[in-house]
């Protein structure tokens, strides 16, 4: 079985590498699938993130047509505040708007991971509750100026400077970073990949 990560995210690549526990025989390649990430009318956040993870895995599988026995991992992460999906910011003003909305509140981070093979696709969903401290305008301005939030769902990275804003989490840290390790290991183990 040839493992493929359907993502160019450096965070997902690093997390998937951790699953190998340093073993030289744990290898994977990466592809960059292109899918439409527009939510469907009335689609619930849980359904949306699981659909995107599966579509990324299947689109990645289509890119591996010449590969022997590909098993493709797709993943997607969203931040949900009061039932609104907060994706990646479109610009700095949007990042500031999102951070102001998260300030002093709890939100849910949902990450879905899917494994697609020729005959089946399996999906796991992980949810983590994250509570932010109250952010000042100066905090928000400085953080956005760092550019860190610009490629991240919810406009922050818990593993970077944005971790300064996290008061507490309930659930999986790796879910918030972008690839839930326990659930990903389970999917790989069920597929015979160790």
Curated annotation (Swiss-Prot):
Coiled coil stretches, renumbered: none
Biological process (GO), any one: nucleotide metabolic process
The keyword Kinase is annotated on this UniProt entry: no
Top-level taxonomic group: Bacteria
Catalytic activity: dTTP + H2O = dTMP + diphosphate + H(+); UTP + H2O = UMP + diphosphate + H(+)
CC terms in the record's Gene Ontology section: cytoplasm
CDD domains listed in its UniProt record: Maf
Keyword Cytoplasm annotated: yes
Keywords: Cytoplasm, Hydrolase, Nucleotide metabolism
Localization annotation: Cytoplasm
Pfam families named in the record: Maf (PF02545)
Catalytic site positions: 76 (proton acceptor)
InterPro entries per record: ITPase-like_fam, Maf-like
Top EC class, one word: hydrolase
GO MF term (any one): dTTP diphosphatase activity
Residues at the site labelled Important for substrate specificity: 11, 77, 159
EC number, UniProt record: 3.6.1.9
Cofactor: a divalent metal cation
Primary location: cytoplasm
Biological function: Nucleoside triphosphate pyrophosphatase that hydrolyzes dTTP and UTP. May have a dual role in cell division arrest and in preventing the incorporation of modified nucleotides into cellular nucleic acids.
HAMAP family per the UniProt record, alphabetical: Maf (MF_00528)
Family: Belongs to the Maf family. YhdE subfamily.
NCBIfam families hit by this protein: maf
Protein name per Swiss-Prot or TrEMBL: dTTP/UTP pyrophosphatase
């Amino acid at each position: 079985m040839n493992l493929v990560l359907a993502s160019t995210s450096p965070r997902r690549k690093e997390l998937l590498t951790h699953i190998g526990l340093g073993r030289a025989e744990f290898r994977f390649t990466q592809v960059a699938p292109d899918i439409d990430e527009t939510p469907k009318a009335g689609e619930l956040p849980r359904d949306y993130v699981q659909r995107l993870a599966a579509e990324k895995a299947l689109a990645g599988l289509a890119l591996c047509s010449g590969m022997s026995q590909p098993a493709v991992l797709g993943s997607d992460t969203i931040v949900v505040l009061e039932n609104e999906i907060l994706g990646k910011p479109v610009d700095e003003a949007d990042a500031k708007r999102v951070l102001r909305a998260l300030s002093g509140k709890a939100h849910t981070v949902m990450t879905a991971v899917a494994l697609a093979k020729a005959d089946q696709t399996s999906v796991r969903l992980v949810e983590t509750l994250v509570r932010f401290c109250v952010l000042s305008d100066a905090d928000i301005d400085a953080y956005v100026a760092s550019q860190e939030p610009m490629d991240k769902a919810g406009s922050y990275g818990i593993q970077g400077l944005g971790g300064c804003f996290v008061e507490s989490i309930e659930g999986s840290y790796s879910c918030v970073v972008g690839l839930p390790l326990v659930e990903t290991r389970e999917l790989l183990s069920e597929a015979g990949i160790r």
